[in-house]
Amino acid sequence: MSSGGLLLLLGLLTLWEVLTPVSSTDRPDFCELPEDSGSCKGNFEAFYYNSDQHQCLEFIYGGCDGNANNFKTIEECKLTCAA
C-alpha cells in the first residue's frame, strides 16, 4: 500500500475513533456520579452525565468542590460519558 493510502487509512481510523460513541463498558466510573454543584456560591454553566436518562444535562456549578462528573461543554461530556 502506498504511503498516501496508509495516511488515508490512518485518517479514517482516527475519525472513526472520535465519532464513535463511548460504550457503557468503556464509560469512566465517575460518569455514574450524581450532579454536584459544589460548596461555593459561583454561578457557572456546566454539564454532567445523567446515567438514568443516558444523556448530558446542564447544571449550575458553584466553582469549587463537586465531583468529576462535571464538564465545561456538552461536547466534552458526550465524548467522555454518553453512549
From Swiss-Prot:
Expressed by the venom gland. Keywords: Disulfide bond, Protease inhibitor, Secreted, Serine protease inhibitor, Signal. Disulfide bonds join C31-C81, C40-C64, C56-C77. It is found in: Secreted. Residues 31-81 form the BPTI/Kunitz inhibitor domain. SMART domains: KU (SM00131). It comes from the Eukaryota. The keyword Secreted applies. One of its GO terms (molecular function) is serine-type endopeptidase inhibitor activity. The keyword Zinc does not apply. GO terms for cellular component: extracellular space. The record marks K41, G42 as: Reactive bond for trypsin. Residues 1-24 form the signal peptide. Its main location: secreted. InterPro entries: Kunitz_BPTI (IPR002223), Kunitz_BPTI_sf (IPR036880), Prtase_inh_Kunz-CS (IPR020901), TFPI/VKTCI-like (IPR050098). SUPFAM superfamilies: BPTI-like. Pfam families: Kunitz_BPTI (PF00014). Serine protease inhibitor. Belongs to the venom Kunitz-type family. This is Kunitz-type serine protease inhibitor nigrescinin-6. It comes from Cryptophis nigrescens (Eastern small-eyed snake). The lineage of its organism: Eukaryota, Metazoa, Chordata, Craniata, Vertebrata.
